[in-house]
């Protein structure tokens, strides 16, 4: 069965940033398609980068409005993947970093699609947004990784997101790395491979 791993990069980055992770993911490369698109908008603060939505003020209201717009951009990407690769959503895992992981979680919780998994790396959502969502009844598994030394997105957001998911009876695993900043550590990669170990 074909597997799709969809990477969603962070703010100011591009699709090339995360695609190299495929070399560390223990999936049969012949059976797996790794897809890492650029976000739809040029980044305001990085000429060579892209953004899923603006982050000028970094306020909750800006985040809410940005996620609403980005939702439809991601929807088009996923619809195209399902059509072009003749797969259903259970054959898709979404790995997001920072802004990309916020979008992945936001999208998955509201869309009635059972993805194989949603992997959030250093970018969970605050309670102010989680509590406003209209949650779909889905069976997607969530893996939430965050470094405790992160000075860009506070790690307590990962704790909040995991608690929220557990309260809604989702399958969720929280992994905190004491020695990791706003990055992806070997511990995160190990956890991803554990999650994928029994992906048939």
Give each language-model segment a name.
Residues 94-96, 121, 145:
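Short beta-strand immediately N-terminal to the catalytic nucleophile in serine-hydrolase-like folds
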Residues 86-96:
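Alpha/beta-hydrolase fold nucleophile elbow
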Residues 2-87:
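Serine-hydrolase catalytic machinery in alpha/beta-hydrolase-like enzymes
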Residues 113-126:
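A conserved short beta-strand
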Residues 95-100, 104:
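Gly/Ala-rich beta-loop-alpha elbow adjacent to hydrolase catalytic centers
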Residues 143-146, 150:
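Short beta-strand/loop motif that positions the catalytic acidic residue
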Residues 16, 151-157, 185:
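Conserved alpha/beta-hydrolase "acid-adjacent" motif
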Residues 143, 159-200:
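C-terminal catalytic histidine-bearing segment of alpha/beta-hydrolase fold enzymes
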